[in-house]
Amino acid sequence: MKRILLISAVILLFINISLAQEKFPSIIPFDEKKLTSDIMTPEVLWSFGRITEMSVAPDGKSIVYGVRYFNIQMNKGQTDFFKINTDGTNKMRLTGSSDAKFGVKWRPDGKRIGYVSNRSGIMQAWEMKPDGSDLRQMSYISDGISEFKYSPDGKKVLYLREVKIDKTVHDIYNDLPKSNARIIDDLMYRHWDEWEDGLYSHIFISDYISENIKDGIDINAGEGWDIPMKPFGGIEQINWSSDSKKIVYATKKMRGKEYAVSTNSEVYVYDLSTKATENISEGMMGFEFAPVCSPDGQYIAWTSMERDGYESDKTRIFIYNTSTKEKVYATKDFDQNADGLEWSKDSKSIYFVSGIRATQEIFRYDLAD
C-alpha cells in the first residue's frame, strides 16, 4: 500500500511539473554558445546571460542567483535561477520557464528557496527545494505582492503590496467608468515614466505557518507614500532586526510639492510588539537610505546624504547605537561614496562598495577605529 502511495505521489509530481512547463514554456534554448570569432557582434552580446541577483545560503556553502536571457526573434526576456557552490563547483539550473520571477532568496533554515513569480496569474511568493524540485505557492494575497523577506527566526514574513490611498477620477465620477483622464492639481503626479495612480507600496507583516504566508497587517495603514522609495528603491530599504522583533526602513513621508522638491528621507524603526514607529534619523536633512541592523542588535547602519534637495551629494555611512541613541558619522575621513552595506558576523565591521579609479571595490570599516 505504501509503495502504491509513493508511486502515485511521484506521478502527481511529474504531472504538476509538466503542466507548469506547458503553461510557461521556456523561450530560451539553454545550449552552450559556440563562438567562432573574437568579434563582439550585437547577436553575440545578446546571447549572453545577465546576472540579476544572488543570495548566499545560510551555511555559506552555496549561492543561488538569477540570470536573464533574451530571445531576439521573440523580442522577449526570461529570468531563471541557478545554484552553485561557493568554490565554483556543482552548478545547476533550478528553473526553466518563462514566467516572470525575481527576488530569489534562501529561507533562514536553508531548507528551501523563495522568490516572487506570476505563475498563478499575479505576483505571489513561491518556494522550492534547493535542487529546484517541489515548487509550491506560499501566498494567496489579493492583488498580489511585489516582494517579501523572511524574518531571521523564520516565523514571520514581511511583504510589500500596493494599497489604494488617493481617489482616482473613477472614484469621483463613478458615472464615467471608461474615462482615462487624470485629475492633476499638485506635484508629484509623474516620476520619470510612471504616473502617480493613487496606489502606494506598504509593508505588511504576516505569520509564516506551514510554509504559507497569510494576509498580513499593514504597518503603514493610511499613509500616502511609498515604501520602498521610488524610483530606485527595492527590498534592500527594508530589513529585520536580528531578533525578528523590529523592522527598519527608509522612506520620505511627504506629499505633493514638498515630496517632489525634497530629498529628505528618514530611517524608521517599527516595533512588532508595541506597534510603535520611531524616527531615528530626525534632524538629518538629506537622503537616508537602506538601513541594516547588526547581528548583535546593538547598531543600525545606513547610507546618508547631508543636504536636502542635493541628489549628487556624497553618500556617507552613519551608525546608530540602539542603547545610547547616538549616531556616528563613520566615513568622515573617507572621501568617496559608500553603498551596499553589509555587517560582519561579529558586528565589529561593515563591508561596503565604493567606486574608485573607474572600478567598484569592496572596503571594510572597523567600528573599533
Spans of model-derived segments:
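Bacterial Sec-dependent N-terminal signal peptides
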Residues: 1-25
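Mature N-terminal segment immediately following signal peptide/propeptide cleavage
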Residues: 29-68
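A flexible loop/linker signature enriched in serine peptidases of the S9 family
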Residues: 24, 48, 67-80, 95-102, ...
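Residue-level detector of Asp-centered blade-edge/turn motifs that repeat once per structural unit
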Residues: 58-59, 108-109, 152-153, 242-243, ...
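Blade/loop signatures of beta-propeller domains
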Residues: 22-39, 75, 201, 206-208, ...
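Short loop/turn segments that connect beta-strands within beta-propeller blades
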Residues: 85-89, 129-133, 208-211, 271-275, ...
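Hydrophobic beta-strand positions that form the internal "hydrophobic ladder"
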Residues: 60-63, 110-114, 157, 247, ...
